[in-house]
From Swiss-Prot:
Keywords: Initiation factor, Protein biosynthesis, RNA-binding, Translation regulation. Residues 8-21 have a biased composition (Basic and acidic residues). The gene is eif4e3-a. This is Eukaryotic translation initiation factor 4E type 3-A. One of its GO terms (cellular component) is eukaryotic translation initiation factor 4F complex. MRNA binds at W109, E110, R163, D164, R165, E166, D167, I168.
Length: 218
């Protein structure tokens, strides 16, 4: 799916400290429609933007309570409305993350619709984080990974997490048992040939030591 160019942005500016105060009032001020958007070029499926802060040692309940839903987009136009009006990745404080998930699923390992899947995880230089995030978002909503997954699998999300030295990008899939058939990483390298990825690996959610078998963290 070819996506139109982004309109001019009007971003919220984050607080200067380690707290990013993007509350429901702020989200309302983004100028997004209050009802699901139906006008414009439809996406193949809806996608939901999420924001959270990840801290070591948090419980599953704390992880879920830290999640803040930004908006569910149904069209290319509403995607750009959200993307252009939330703080840049480079303005997020350390340990904060953005996620874009298929439908309204949450970026939690044990969410029922996620539990059998996993993520391709990689470190990226901070100066490349914004470009990598944008390109992976566009590839994801444009369904460019469809023919790179096994027939019984799909990409269900993408995340970017800010860390001290290098940031972390993750691409989520729904079925870890068939990941050997996937060429998702090859597609990522094709999309971003000039990016130096480090510590690249795939990990099923169920192999995380903190996987709780119910609903948990990311």
């Amino acid at each position: 799916m070819a996506l139109p160019a982004a309109p001019a942005d009007r971003r919220l500016q984050p607080e200067p400290d380690e707290q990013l105060h993007l509350n429901h009032q702020d989200i309302g001020e983004l100028g997004l429609p209050q009802e699901p958007d139906t006008e414009g070029i439809p996406l193949h499926s809806p996608w939901t933007f999420w924001l959270d802060r990840s801290l070591p040692g948090t419980t599953a309940a704390e992880c879920e309570s830290n999640l803040k839903k930004i908006y569910t987009v149904h069209t290319i136009q509403s995607f750009w409305s959200v993307y252009n009006n939330i703080p840049l990745v480079t303005n997020l404080p350390v340990r904060w993350s953005y996620h874009l998930m298929r439908g309204e699923r949450k970026p939690l390992w044990e969410e029922e619709s996620n539990a059998k899947g996993g993520v391709w995880k990689m470190k990226v230089p901070k100066e490349a984080s914004s470009l990598v995030w944008k390109e992976l978002l566009l590839a994801t909503i444009g369904e460019q990974f469809t023919d790179r997954c096994a027939p019984e699998d799909e990409v269900i999300g993408v995340s970017v997490s800010v860390r001290d030295r290098e940031d972390i990008v993750q691409v989520w899939n729904g079925n870890a048992s068939v990941v050997a058939e996937a060429t998702v990483l090859e597609k990522i390298y094709e999309l971003l040939p000039n990016t130096s990825f480090k510590a690249v690996f795939y990990k099923p959610h169920e192999e995380h030591h903190a996987f709780e078998g119910g609903r948990s963290r990311h």
